Each structure stands twice: as C-alpha cells, then as structure tokens.
C-alpha cells in the first residue's frame, strides 16, 4: 500500500525510528484512551495484527469502517477505538490499522499524507497527473489513509513498477528496498 511506502520513507528520512516503535510514540493520546495501546507497534498496524477492535463490515451503516468513511472528524472516530486482544495474535483486515499508521506518519513527519505522496512518490516517479486523497473535512484535513487515494490508473501502475524495480526510478532510490 502507499501508506506502507510512506512509512518506509519516513523511517529512511529519520522521522520514525523503526517499525518496532509503539504507535503511542507518535499518537500519545491513544495511551490515554487505553494503556494497552502502548503495546501496539507500527509493525502490528502494518501487518494488521494490532488487536484493535474494528468492524470491517461494509453491509452495516453503523460499523467502524462506515463511520470512518462518513465522519467529518477522524480524530474523534479514532478516539473511540478499543483494544480487543493483545497485538500480534492474529491477522484481521482493519482499515483502522491503516488509518492509525497514516496518522502516525503525519504526526512524525509534520506533513499531510497528500503532501508526502506528491513530493516523495508522484514527483520522483514522473506521475502524469496529481493525485488527491479524500479527507475527513476541509477544516481538519485528515486523510482517509485507509482508502480514497485518487489517481490515474497509469500512475498507480507506476507504483507497481516502482515496487518491481525495488524502489528505484532510474538511478534514484525513491523508497527503501
């Protein structure tokens, strides 16, 4: 995913120490919600093994994923997340994990995800058109990191080629291999 590429770049650039960092290093408010969030590492979010209770149920308008799609305040939606089990127990697809990862990257780098995509992926890849990332509201501007990156198919194909080329575009290493 694009968020995983941005995480690799944030680590390479020294904004994030590594994938074994607890998410609470970047989102300390989670630990105030529930001290067990301190056990959740970026690695757990990346692998969707966080143990966070998150309903990925697209048929229900009241599921967590529906709330994340519709909310105008993702920060408030994230504040409602709960720990269901210790991290790294089992894989469970979770848009919530990707959202937390995106928020941690933004907090660590001091940049919005769409800014990082534009300068650190799209420009070096030679993308044909700008991408846009849907946000919770014009006022808050929090990217819906779990979805909603809008771009041309050709530019998404460039991401695939970037991965096939081990993160390189010509001689330039765009993302860590």
Regions found by a protein language model. Give the residues of each.
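Active-site SXXK
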Residues: 1-19, 45, 101-105, 156-162
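Active-site helix/loop module of the DD-peptidase/beta-lactamase fold
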Residues: 12-52, 80-82, 109-146, 151
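Short, solvent-exposed loop/turn and secondary-structure capping segments
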Residues: 56-60
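Amphipathic alpha-helical interface segments
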Residues: 61-80
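Acidic/His-rich structured neighborhood in mature extracellular/periplasmic domains
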Residues: 81, 86, 98
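A penicillin-recognizing enzyme superfamily signal
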Residues: 149, 170-177
């Amino acid at each position: 995913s694009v968020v995983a590429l941005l995480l690799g770049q944030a680590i390479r650039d020294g904004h994030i120490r590594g994938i074994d960092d607890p998410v609470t290093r970047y989102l300390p408010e989670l630990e105030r919600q529930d001290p067990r969030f301190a056990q959740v590492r970026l690695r757990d979010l990346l692998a969707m093994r966080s143990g966070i209770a998150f309903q990925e149920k697209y048929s229900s308008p009241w599921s967590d994923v529906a709330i994340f799609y519709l909310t105008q305040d993702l920060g408030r939606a994230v504040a409602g997340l709960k720990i269901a089990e210790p991290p790294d127990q089992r894989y469970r697809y979770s848009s919530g994990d990707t959202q937390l990862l995106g928020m941690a990257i933004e907090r660590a780098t001091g940049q919005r995800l769409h800014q990082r995509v534009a300068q650190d992926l799209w420009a070096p890849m030679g993308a044909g058109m700008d991408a846009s990332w849907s946000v919770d509201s014009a006022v808050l501007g929090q990217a819906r990191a779990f979805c909603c990156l809008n771009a041309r198919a050709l530019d998404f194909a460039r991401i695939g080629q970037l991965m096939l080329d081990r993160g390189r575009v010509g001689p330039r290493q765009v993302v860590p291999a």
